Curated annotation (Swiss-Prot):
This is Large ribosomal subunit protein uL1. GO terms for biological process: regulation of translation; translation. PANTHER family: 54S RIBOSOMAL PROTEIN L1, MITOCHONDRIAL, LARGE RIBOSOMAL SUBUNIT PROTEIN UL1M. Part of the 50S ribosomal subunit. Binds directly to 23S rRNA. The L1 stalk is quite mobile in the ribosome, and is involved in E site tRNA release. GO terms for cellular component: cytosol; large ribosomal subunit; peptidoglycan-based cell wall; plasma membrane. Belongs to the universal ribosomal protein uL1 family. NCBIfam families: rplA_bact. SUPFAM superfamilies: Ribosomal protein L1. It comes from Mycobacterium tuberculosis (strain ATCC 25618 / H37Rv). PROSITE patterns: RIBOSOMAL_L1.
Length: 235
């Protein structure tokens, strides 16, 4: 939705920019300010008090959202033999090795997450410049370089999300769809924020969660109180 459109302005007028909403209030308001007919994605944007230029202040992690994202992720797996068979059985959308790498080198990128067995990483490294900038490069820290590919596929299909701070110290991740009940969105929010808090670098000084907004892909940002992570029972 264009930020100059009449519908967007009407939605933005519902948000009090001087107020910090609770997670539950923000989830409810995000639903109300999504004016698209499609089931919009609900997203969280966080400004962190870290310096991403410093290796010890990189914030990167994963979390299994208790209620999923509302979207079935398309998963690519780099594996051979029994591991490849296990990935297929677990529901991976595409499985391969050199053939899959060649396909990606040719421009095919129709997947949302990639998993690799450790023995495949030397080969996968050939497409690191393609996968890395898109957040698709398998990494042991996110559980996507693993011998247990079946579990990794199941986790991602079940609502596991990855997040990584960008160069501007921002984090972005999805917590569900506008069709979700606001309580479910708030619970997903709480699970994700708790993990972000757990990963706070010891070298990060001062305020860690500087600013948080919740919004749909078509709606205005709703400011959330950074001091509250779990507020499900009421407002």
């Amino acid at each position: 939705m264009s930020k100059t459109s009449k519908a967007y302005r009407a939605a933005a007028a519902k948000v009090d920019r001087t107020n910090l909403y609770t997670p539950l209030q923000a989830a409810k308001l995000a639903k109300e300010t999504s004016s698209t007919k499609q089931d919009a994605t609900v997203e969280v944007a966080i400004r962190l008090g870290v310096d991403p230029r410093k290796a010890d202040q990189m914030v990167r992690g994963t979390v299994n959202l208790p209620h999923g994202t509302g979207k079935t992720a398309r998963v690519a797996v780099f594996a051979v033999g029994e591991k490849a068979d296990a990935a297929v059985a677990a529901g991976a959308d595409v499985v391969g090795s050199d053939d899959l790498i060649e396909r990606i080198q040719g421009g095919w990128l129709e997947f949302d997450a990639a998993i690799a067995t450790p023995d495949q990483m030397a080969k996968v490294g050939r497409i690191a410049r393609v996968l890395g900038p898109r957040g698709l490069m398998p990494n042991p820290k996110t559980g996507t370089v693993t011998a247990d590919v079946a579990k990794a596929v199941a986790d991602i299909k079940g609502g596991k999300i990855n997040f990584r701070v960008d160069k501007q110290a921002n984090l972005h991740f999805v917590i569900g769809k506008a069709s979700f009940d606001e309580k479910l969105l708030a619970e997903n929010y709480g699970a994700a924020i708790d993990e972000v808090l757990r990963l706070k670098p010891s070298s990060s000084k001062g305020r860690y969660l500087k600013k948080i907004t919740v919004s749909t892909t078509t709606g205005p940002g709703i400011p959330v109180d950074p001091s509250i992570t779990r507020n499900f029972a009421g407002e």
